[in-house]
């Protein structure tokens, strides 16, 4: 499961996820990518589930890059605990996703295989996504 090795502070404020992705919005490493067209949060479990779906479909071919990392802690209070008495403990980590962010990239497989692998991965994610390919000469 992906999570930060160390953090300066254990807990973080909720914040607001606004704007569009200005970084990580183009295919940089592979030939094909899965790009988010939606705004939201991806948990470490969702990122891993989609990665497994891609890996299983392409079998031994290709190289996969995960372009997002869950570095924001989400804290929750236990069930049936009254309000107050401080903030709950960090339960899991999420990656904040803006529209336009490339989530996964792949190289070394035909386009049709990559499309199908990303379609299976997209079913595991709570965001709308689109298939993108590298811009030649860019």
Swiss-Prot record:
Keyword rRNA-binding recorded: yes
Biased composition (Basic residues): 1-13
Keyword Coiled coil: no
Keywords associated with the record: Ribonucleoprotein, Ribosomal protein, RNA-binding, rRNA-binding, tRNA-binding
Gene Ontology CC: cytosolic large ribosomal subunit
Region (Disordered): 1-22
Coiled coil segments of this chain: none
Single GO MF descriptor: tRNA binding
Any one GO BP annotation for this protein: translation
Quaternary organization: Part of the 50S ribosomal subunit.
Physiological role: Binds 23S rRNA and is also seen to make contacts with the A and possibly P site tRNAs.
Family: Belongs to the universal ribosomal protein uL16 family.
Protein's name in the database: Large ribosomal subunit protein uL16
Species: Delftia acidovorans (strain DSM 14801 / SPH-1)
Gene that this sequence comes from: rplP
């Amino acid at each position: 499961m992906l999570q930060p090795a160390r953090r300066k502070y254990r807990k973080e404020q909720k914040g607001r996820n606004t704007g569009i992705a200005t970084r990580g919005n183009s295919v940089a490493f592979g030939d094909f990518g899965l790009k988010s067209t939606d705004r939201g949060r991806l948990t470490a479990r969702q990122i891993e589930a989609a990665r497994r779906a891609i890996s299983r479909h392409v079998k031994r071919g290709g190289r996969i890059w995960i372009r997002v990392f869950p570095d924001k802690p989400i804290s929750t209070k236990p069930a049936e605990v009254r309000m107050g008495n401080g903030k709950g403990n960090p339960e899991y980590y999420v990656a904040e996703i803006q529209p336009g962010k490339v989530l996964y990239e792949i190289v070394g497989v035909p386009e049709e295989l990559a499309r199908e692998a990303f379609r299976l991965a997209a079913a595991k994610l709570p965001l709308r996504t689109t298939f993108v390919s590298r811009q030649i000469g860019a």
